[in-house]
Swiss-Prot record:
Domain ATP-grasp: residue ranges: 109-316
Top-level taxon: Bacteria
Protein name: Phosphoribosylamine--glycine ligase
Residues involved in ATP binding: 135-196
Organism lineage string: Bacteria, Pseudomonadati, Pseudomonadota, Gammaproteobacteria, Pasteurellales
GO MF annotations, alphabetized: ATP binding; metal ion binding; phosphoribosylamine-glycine ligase activity
Cofactor: record remark: Binds 1 Mg(2+) or Mn(2+) ion per subunit.
Alphabetical keyword list: ATP-binding, Ligase, Magnesium, Manganese, Metal-binding, Nucleotide-binding, Purine biosynthesis
Length: 429
């Protein structure tokens, strides 16, 4: 069958690469795709924006698309799934109503509270003065979040009260994130270890994907500004089998059942960004209604099952009949970013060494365009170099060796991706 993937990032390159390996996939279209998806066998880019829902539906109808997988959040939040379903097309992702779990942080926090799902203490504000009063009452460190979609950058972890007050003023009166920041969520700072817990949902049944851990801060040792993610590895040893079970029982099932009970049946990838507290209690930091980027890249490297089969089963409400198989090895992905990211960054630099990957390694392209036959930088996060290894340390060393070979002017990356897992491995050795 023909398959359509919506999006243009490193995540979509990884999804297209994995989907193309399925014997069921005749042709894989990516809208709009990037220079990386264009290089894959069986894969073709389509010049349609990820949010041009009408054109996407028309394309799917004209090209006999048997399955569509949505990569990014923006098309989900505007109802791409509703439109495809109305046209009788199979699409894997949540409806517009269900996608509020990512589209509105205030909706999510209120939902978690209603269903007694563990999360940080919080309050929502639309006015500056009450928000500032709450900050002064609670003190720092404290977290300030823009309510709407802000490309992963609308979260300020304020270590001082001054920083928190500045963030509130900037979002509510300074209009830093436009409509997305017209309401803010202020919540307690959770001090634990983060994990990305991604599952597939068919409305009621849940199939967990491999666990992972993302690194949001731009600098080594988790310093500097928040980004969309500078690297990730899988599995995340912080999620022990016992904690895995707690997450399923205390977070995932209550979320899926709670959404269904409120009339928002959830199908699609559900990503719970969790803080695992020192006592092993998982708390929800955020939900995303799609696969994470860069977590998708190392996770797809470990997935041995047919992703198309899993998605089709989920679309048909038969996910309980499938079991995902995973490679025993660890995988790790390092994002190579353009100079200046996450602020204003350089563009248009020629990239070399993309073809350096050997077996058990893969370079996934994100902010890259093909200009007159040359690959040049065209985004903040440019590529994600990923590798498998017997341990997280091995995978890290393989990925670092690959990162050395992919070059352009001003590229930078974190050399410590996976450091928590590596420290655990050393302690357990």
């Amino acid at each position: 069958m023909n398959i359509l993937i919506i999006g243009n990032g490193g995540r979509e390159h990884a999804l297209a690469w994995k989907v193309a390996q399925s014997p069921m996939a005749e042709k894989v279209f990516v809208a709009p795709g990037n220079a990386g998806t264009a290089l894959e066998e069986k894969v073709e880019n389509v010049a349609i924006s990820a949010t041009d829902v009408e054109k996407l539906v028309a394309f799917a109808q004209a090209n006999h698309i048997g399955l569509t997988i949505v990569g990014p959040e923006a098309p989900l939040v505007i109802g791409v799934v509703d439109a495809f379903r109305a046209a009788g097309l199979k699409i894997f992702g949540p409806t517009k109503a269900a996608a509020q779990l990512e589209g509105s942080k205030a909706f999510t926090k209120d939902f978690l509270a209603r269903h007694h799902i563990p999360t940080a203490e919080y309050q929502n504000f639309t006015e500056v003065e009450p928000a500032l009063a709450y900050l002064r009452e609670k003190g720092a460190p404290i977290v300030v979040k823009a309510d709407g979609l802000a490309a992963g950058k609308g979260v300020i972890v304020a270590m001082t009260l001054d920083e928190a007050e500045a963030a509130v003023k900037e979002m509510l009166s300074g209009n830093a994130f436009g409509e997305a920041g017209s309401r803010v969520v202020i919540e307690e700072f959770l001090d634990g270890e983060e994990a990305s817990f991604i599952v597939m949902v068919d409305g009621k049944n849940v199939e967990p994907m491999a666990t992972s851990q993302d690194h949001k801060r731009v600098g080594e040792n988790d310093t500097g500004l928040n980004t969309g993610g500078m690297g990730a590895y899988s599995p995340a040893p912080v999620v022990t089998p016992e904690i895995h079970e707690r997450i399923m029982q205390q977070v995932i099932y209550p979320t899926v059942n709670g959404m269904a009970a409120e009339g928002n049946i959830y199908t699609g990838f559900l990503y719970a960004g969790l803080m695992i507290m020192p006592n092993g209690q998982p708390k929800v930091i955020e939900f995303n209604c799609r696969f994470g980027d860069p977590e998708t890249q190392p996770i797809m490297l470990r997935l041995e099952s047919d992703l198309v089969e899993l998605c089709l089963a989920a679309c048909d409400g038969k996910l309980d009949q499938k079991k995902s198989q995973w490679c025993e090895q660890a995988s790790l992905g390092i994002v190579l970013a353009a100079e200046g990211y996450p602020g204003d960054y350089r563009k248009g630099d020629e990239i070399t060494g993309i073809e350096s990957a050997v077996e058990n390694q893969k370079v996934f392209l994100a902010g890259v365009e093909n200009k007159d036959g040359k690959l040049v930088t065209n985004g903040g996060r440019v590529v994600c170099v990923t590798a498998l290894g017997d341990t997280v340390y091995d995978a890290q060393q393989q990925a670092l060796a690959l990162a050395e070979q992919v070059k352009w002017t001003g590229r930078f990356y974190r050399r410590d991706i996976g450091y928590r897992a590596v420290a655990r491995e050393k302690n357990n050795a």
